[in-house]
Amino acid sequence: MKKYIFLFFAVCAFSVYANAQNRTGDCTSYTSDDRSVTFYLNDSSAIQLRLCSQSTVRIWFSPDGSFQRNNPSFAVVNEDLEDVGTVHVDEQNACYEIFTPKLRIRVNKSPFNLQIFDKYQKLLFSDYADKGHISNGQRKLEYKTLRRDEHFFGLGEKTGKLDRRGEAYKMWNSDKPCYSAVEDPLYKSIPFLMISYLNAIFLENTYKTELNFLT
């Protein structure tokens, strides 16, 4: 059984809806360096894709186009899981594409949209239309495509159903005793999700985050 893991470094929240927002600009150019490819948008934001392995992608969205960390990761010990060789970007009129033996990564230029497929062209992950990355004042939101038969498992010690679909959870520790069977947040945040399409997401983010799986 093959699994694909996508790692996220972003100031964001996953949602299905929101109020008035500004979407990101269109993708205009890119640079590549070793394992990483950085795509630049015409609103000064940027998104960086780093191939940790042939089936693992680190996705880092930066609203200001800067990719500087204040501290080393508290969770990821080693990003480079295996040799991926030289990363090549195939530029087409409407998109950029990156291929590995296991993945096809597509970056649509206008509107900006990120999609990841397996080697059989089955869609594993996709931004929702042109709303993949949204700014709403100080809030940053991420909208992803939710399929009718998609289910989510994980997030560690959380209340509620084993299948997280239809629920919303906060990633913000709260050491509250005597909690109920449906209370959230709790004392620990483990932002790792296993998805029924045989892929997984790890969200590395120190900001207060809400994961919303409502249909």
Task: State what each model feature region is.
Residues 4-13:
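Sec-dependent N-terminal signal peptides
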Residues 13-19:
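C-terminal segment of classical bacterial N-terminal signal peptides
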Residues 19-215:
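N-terminal accessory segment at the very beginning of proteins
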